[in-house]
Design a protein with these regions (language model features):
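Sequence termini and other peripheral, non-core segments
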Residues: 1-75, 79-180
């Protein structure tokens, strides 16, 4: 679970995602957005996993209940950030939509998560109104974090810990990555 904050503009940020993340992060971002809806607009209840363990779930009062993904990793910093206010949610939604477009551009296919586009387009009804957008909280090892700079932290994370994934189909290598 993460939000790869590689550029403040969601379109450019999506283009900077490496090939592996273009595929994988579409699912994770849909999970983050779905979790925001469930936790903010849903009613909490206790359910049981397939193994019989108790688990918290949130039931939505409308069609979203049968459309959106289940809530997951609810205390992860990326999840907390995504549901903190409508501006953070909106930025993540725009990144996700641009990543869906990027997936189609790179692979000439439509990602299965595109079916959630309409359901996630509107922020949760009860989400806090944000006065300003904040940068996603870095979720990575401390040795690559740059104090008070999420963008530099995520670029560091990519250049130091994600080199094995450094492929960009139909895209040039990002200039900040190529400079290392």
């Amino acid at each position: 679970m993460n939000i790869f904050y590689l550029h403040p503009d969601p379109k450019t940020c999506a283009e900077y995602h490496n090939d592996k993340h273009v595929v994988k992060m579409i699912i994770e971002y849909a999970q983050l957005l779905s979790t925001a809806h469930r936790m903010i607009d849903g009613d909490e209840y206790i359910d049981f996993t397939a193994n019989g363990r108790k688990i918290k779930r949130w039931r939505l009062p409308d069609d979203r209940e049968h459309t959106l993904m289940k809530a997951s990793h609810i205390n992860h910093p990326s999840n907390v950030w995504a549901r903190a206010n409508h501006l953070n949610y909106k930025w993540l939604y725009e990144l996700w939509c641009n990543l869906l477009d990027e997936y189609t551009y790179r692979y000439d296919k439509t990602h299965s998560c595109a079916r959630l586009k309409d359901a996630l387009a509107k922020a949760p009804e009860k989400i806090s109104v944000g006065l300003r957008e904040s940068e996603p909280t870095p979720a990575m090892p401390d040795d690559v974090k740059v104090l008070n700079d999420s963008l530099a932290s995520y670029r560091n994370y990519y250049t130091k810990n994600k080199t094995h994934l450094a492929k960009w189909k139909k895209r040039p290598v990002p200039e900040w990555y190529a400079a290392i």
